[in-house]
Amino acid sequence: MSRILLIIAIIILNNCASVRNPEGGPVDEIPPTLVSTNPQTLTSITPKQKVTIRFSEYLKESSIKNSIQVYPMNGEKIKYEFKGDKIDVMLPENLNNEMTYIIMFDTGLLDEHSIPIKHDISIPFTMSSEFDTSKIEGHVYGDFDNSTILLWRGNLDRATMLDTNPDYIANTNDDNKFTFNYLPEEKFSVLAVQQYGSNIDYAKGQYAFYHETTLSTKDKNLDKINFFIHKALSLIHI
């Protein structure tokens, strides 16, 4: 009797271990989305505070490291803990009391089936009681699939922009539109590049400066900040 029970137990365990989607079944093509953050509203936070970010499905752990960033950049390494469909992010220590920061996940973030998020996800946080609300947006036109907009605080000359890491980064969406949200009311310098990354010298690739030396959000939000990048021709702004 014990031998029969042992055989039955082995069969049950084997069946449990072999559970999988049937051959030819539907393939998961649904991008992961942001579900919630805890705390829900990230105002009046404290340095090094833990923020739990939950997604709609399990993530691929290896994709997180190169897809998460905090803006404006302050050079501090981001600390986080992976928990399946959640990420615990430990906020940076050296924070400005009046600044609104952004945790951003770009489209390099993948679910466990290697499906990327559809567009960048931005999560604002601040030590203040309210977020900055200024915005800069526009389009990048050209014969390419996507591009990246680099934004610096202050009035920088072109040589400095090509040799300095930006404070903020935004990628264009499927409509070639970019948006910077939660900006302070101040002056900015901006540059559009076809490719940007830690191992890419964007100054040697295709890029375009905006026709105005400096942008200012002190009086209003800015839209129609447009660029044109062409692979074969010289680069111009609109």
State where each predicted segment sits:
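Sec-dependent N-terminal signal peptides
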Residues: 4-13
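A generic hydrophobic-helix recognition signal that picks specific residues
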Residues: 8, 191-192
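A generic secondary-structure signal for well-formed alpha-helical elements
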Residues: 12-15, 196
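Acidic, low-complexity Ser/Thr/Gly/Pro-rich repeat segments typical of extracellular/periplasmic
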Residues: 17-175, 179-182, 187-191, 205-209, ...
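Structured interaction patches on ligand/partner-binding surfaces of diverse proteins
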Residues: 116-119, 195-233
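Coil residues (strongly favoring Ser/Thr
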Residues: 133, 233-234
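Conserved small/polar residues in nucleotide/adenosyl-binding loops
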Residues: 236-238
